[in-house]
């Protein structure tokens, strides 16, 4: 089991709080997240950073005219996901 405790993060830009993530799933948000963390939790100080849910680009152009051979749908969507958009 892998756990990460994000401390001082600002969900949606609100007041700073802690977020506990266990095996890739958010398991606790708030001041009690640290108390629920296992002893071997990996701590990450995110003071001043904002946490947002996954972002979705609903308007995208893949394989622009004249550049069809430079990109495939697979490579274009993979590049978007690596860049933080799903």
Predicted regions and their residues:
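Active-site metal-binding motif and surrounding structural segment of the metallo-beta-lactamase
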Residues: 35-51
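Generic preference for well-ordered secondary structure
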Residues: 10, 39-40, 57-60
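Hydrophobic/aromatic beta-strand patches that form the interior of the parallel beta-sheet core
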Residues: 6, 42-44, 56
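Metal-associated gating/positioning segment near the N- to mid-region
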Residues: 49-86
């Amino acid at each position: 089991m892998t756990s990460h405790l994000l401390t001082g993060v600002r969900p949606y830009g609100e007041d700073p709080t802690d977020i506990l993530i266990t095996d890739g799933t958010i398991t606790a948000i708030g001041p009690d997240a640290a108390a629920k963390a296992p002893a071997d939790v990996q701590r990450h100080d995110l003071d001043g950073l904002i946490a947002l849910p996954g972002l979705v680009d609903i308007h995208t152009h893949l394989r622009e005219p004249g550049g069809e051979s430079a990109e495939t749908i697979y490579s274009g969507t993979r590049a978007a996901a690596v860049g933080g958009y799903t």
